[in-house]
């Protein structure tokens, strides 16, 4: 691999250096991930990066970004692309990494709160099972992993499972 952590330096140039391991999407202390794709009919910046990563990166490079990139927002973006390409494999990684305590500022419209990356991923998968072709078996595997996770109280979906009045 090259210094950016990717196997193809052309890919890094093609997506405006977002794949460099030390570059977050924004130069600030708090990295934000936007849950909504559009806001006031303009596509959010991260989803433009998402389109570029999807266009120029191989599946292996997307997996590498999801697992190893130092930007948590890029981890999330790459995970969503991985989920589109291979839902079973992405869910297996989600379960393997469920105790990850890294946080992001998850923003929906203009409201944002710090949330664990595991929680954001679980909510993404469980809310969009049909969109990403996640099997019932994989969904049940996620439920079991959440219930047995060491950091289950940091995963919003845990409360959905334990309180019938909660919603994703």
Task: State what each model feature region is.
Residues 2-168:
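Extended repeat-based scaffolds of very large eukaryotic assembly and lipid-transport proteins
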